[in-house]
Amino acid sequence: MNIQRETSGHIAAIVTILIWGTTFISTKVLLADFSPMEILFYRFLMGFIALILVRPNMIPFRNWRQELLFAGAGLFGVTLYFLLENIALTYTYASNVGMIVSIIPMITAVLAHFLLEGEKLRLTFLIGFISALIGLLLITFNGNVVLRLNPLGDIMAAGAALVFGGYSIFMKKLSAYEYHIIELTQRVFLYGLLFMVPALFLFDFHFDLSRFSSASNILNMLFLGIGASALCFATWNYSVGVLGAVKSSAYIYMVPVITIAASVLILHENMTWIALLGGALTLLGLYISELKPKAKLLENGCKMDA
């Protein structure tokens, strides 16, 4: 792989995670006036419009196989992931959801092992996963480990992790068609919004634009729609196409670390030594997961990846 291209893939993943790790601040503000379903719909509608304005060209229909991949990516990565996560939060503790969703990299690695060529599970990834998981446990429970299970909510959270892993597989397959990343993300958002429409009638959704008279609501929704949705899904999709589903997903380990840092810097919350240690172990896990396999020299002089 071209080093410059690989570096750009890592940078795209880091930019994505830096923004995703701070979205909780905007979501917290918006929840005072909007339901979770309303935030979800408006942010992706804004994101879709932004992508169309940036690049008006749309991918034409080619064949049903390709269209099913787009539909699957929209259903899994936009509609189901956020719906399942939001529903899970109403049935179980946020700490449970955070921990369960943090297994996305491992789920992605297992799915990629069986469904994608050239993306096999490696020992370094497993070691990195264990290190990151210990770190995330320290961050989430902060030394106060109390096992509080809620089967329905926890199953929903596990479902969210599973569908996001599936989304990465869909995006890796779609990257083979070499479409412009913005056009590709447009189509995924379009299907995500279409699949979201039935949910609008099932959940608490009110089409009340008066709430956008507040500058705070407008700015926070624009951040979620243009920054966290349009920009971040485009950069994430690019990263998956360049690095692969497994390497990209490992960056998800950073989300709780960034969330903790943002809480300290922006909300002036206290940082504990346990959370700091957890952050260090999580970043170590990410580093180990991203290590390249060493090349072994065969008897005939050819190289192979270990």
From Swiss-Prot:
The chain crosses the membrane at residues 11-31, 34-54, 68-88, 97-117, 123-143, 151-171, 188-208, 222-242, 248-268, 271-291. It is found in: Cell membrane. One of its GO terms (cellular component) is plasma membrane. Pfam families: EamA. It is a multi-pass membrane protein. Residues 18-141, 162-291 form the EamA domain. Keywords: Cell membrane, Membrane, Repeat, Transmembrane, Transmembrane helix, Transport. Coiled coil: none annotated. It comes from the Bacteria. This is Uncharacterized transporter YbhF.
